Amino acid sequence: MGLSPRAGGMLQEMTTEWIEVPGGVFRMGGGPRDNENPRHEVRVRSFRLARTQVTREEYQRFLDETSILGRPAPPFWHEPAYAHPRMPAVGPSWEDAVAYCAWLSERTGDPVRLPTEAEWERAATCDREVLYPWGDDPPESLPDYERRWREGPEPVDAWPSLHPLGFLGLGENVHEWCSDWYAADYYRVSPVDDPRGPDSGTRRSSRGGSWRHEIKVSRCAARSAIPPHLRYADYGFRVAS
């Protein structure tokens, strides 16, 4: 069974605000944790990455149009802290995020997918030697930090971009699923060209900080991973093409 809208449903325009990330060579990893080393050279091709994390209103449309498949909403879906339509969609598993990408690809004709870890880090650093997507200053330096992310995420466009390409919330708000299987020692064997992670594993990779940790794991090189079926309220995703 495909992922087409339900019979009789109104076809509504689905648009993603894409940012073109230029291809090139960069130095990946090199942070304080063992799984971020060794620092190594990576070459990625140009790709597009969404300006924002997938929002609740976007994910709700996916749920509505694929309800015949019986995919449940994330367990936190109706809690007030996550209910604003411009909040990031919180709680999708990696499997849910991949299904969303397949649905959006069919809906729009664009080949939508999750970014690789290498692509995410390329977008975050953007030809700069910086600790965080917004620069070298720690998260505590961000505007109004004392009052943000205490009870949950914030709308994806609540604050102006601090990134040179214009990304919103990159490294903030929710952990973002990546396409790769995760291995702590992958950097020891990673190919130079367009690395896509190991061939198998038990956990899928994610990048960026989250509201639950007051975004303190937001470094560009920081890696995290959980099993692909889990649904956590500080996990979301951003699509690539």
Question: For each predicted feature, which ranges?
Answer:
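A short glycine-rich, aromatic-capped structural motif
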Residues: L11-P74, P92-E95, G171-E172
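Short amphipathic alpha-helical segments
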Residues: T15, D64, A118, A240-S241
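A general structural signal for alpha-helical elements within enzymatic catalytic domains
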Residues: G9, D64, A102-S105
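Generic low-complexity, intrinsically disordered sequence content enriched
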Residues: P5-A7, S67, T108
